[in-house]
Structure formats: structure tokens, C-alpha cells
Amino acid sequence: MTEQNESAFNENEEVNEETSQTDSVENNDETTETSQDNLQEDDSQEIAEDVDPKDEEIQQLKKDVQENEEKYLRLYAEFENYKRRIQKENQTMKAYKAQDVLNDILPTIDNIERALQIDGEDEQFKSLKKGVEMVHESLLNALKNNGLEKIETEGQQFDPNVHQAVVQDDNPDFESGQITQELQSGYKLKERVLRPSMVKVNQ
């Protein structure tokens, strides 16, 4: 074998040796990666296996408790609203329980007021009228103590919420829209209008 051939042979052997080493390293790397993947899978399986069913049950119970607490709070709020509504309705009923009775009494008051508008010169008539005035005043005071209030009219500005205009007037002594005369008394029970006042309104 010539020196040139021997040199070429040696070079080929060195190249083959390096290639073998490279392949061996790559194979080792692949084996290492595969082993790591297998270890990770094993760890995941172990973690899954380590979860105690009791812990899962506890978590579920906590969740159920929280849901029940929320339901309870909602029901409690609804019940409190219901109680307040009932209390308000009871207070309203109590405040206006005399409404029907007062409505029945109003015509009697009207008759008394009409009688008081009659004038007479007779002493006996004057004495009788004075007695009726006292009864009228006493009756109104008693009704006032129970929440009845007479609606103000003459000289007031017309308010459709409490006044009923039945006649239009043309009086220079009053401003436009001002009440010049009350034709029938109106009454309120606390804030509720039992009957609007019938009035004459200046145009």
C-alpha cells in the first residue's frame, strides 16, 4: 500500500469514528428527552392519584354551603322587604281607617254650615244659632284630632288637586286664578283629599 493510499484510509477511519460518536450523542439526547417526558407523565399520574376523594368532597361541600348562603341572603332580603311592605300597609290602613266614617259625616257638617248662614233678629233664634255654632266648632275640633283638615280656599290660588272650580268670577279685587268664594267646604284626611272644595275662581 502506498503512502498516499494509507493516508486516505486513515482519514476515512477518523471520519467514520466522528460520525459514530455524533450519532451516539444524538441517540443519547433523544433517550434523555424521552426519559424526561416519561417522568413528567408519571409525575402527573402520581399527582392525579394523590388527590384524595375526601378533598374533592370537601370542596363540593364548601361550594354547596356558599350557594345555600347566597340563597338564604336572597330569601332574607325578600322577607325583610315583605315585612316593611306589610307594616307600611298596616300604618296606612290605621291612618285612614276613619275615612268611611268621615265621608258619612261630611254631609251633616254641610247641613250645619248651611243652617249657620241663616240670619235672624229674634233673641231665641240668636241663642239657638250660637249653640249650633258651638256644636259645629266642637265637632270640627274632634274630627281634626282624628286627622280631618279643612282645605283653605278664599284668597288662595286655585289648585286642581284640592279645589273644584264650578263658577268663574270677574272680580278686580282678586288676581287671575285666585279663589273669590267657597261654595262648599273641602276636607283632607292627613294628606289624602276626602272631598275637594267647590269654589268660584277669578278669570
Curated annotation (Swiss-Prot):
Single GO term (MF): unfolded protein binding
Positions with biased composition (Basic and acidic residues): 56-67
Spans annotated as Disordered: 1-67
Stored InterPro entries: GrpE, GrpE_coiled_coil, GrpE_head
Keywords associated with the record: Chaperone, Cytoplasm, Stress response
CDD domains according to UniProt: GrpE (cd00446)
The keyword Phosphoprotein belongs to this UniProt entry's keyword annotation: no
Keyword Chaperone annotated: yes
Residue ranges, compositional bias (Acidic residues): 39-55
GO terms classed as biological process: protein folding
Membrane-spanning intervals of the chain: none
Biased composition (Polar residues): 1-10
Subunit: Homodimer.
Family: Belongs to the GrpE family.
Name assigned to this protein: Protein GrpE
Recorded name of the encoding gene: grpE
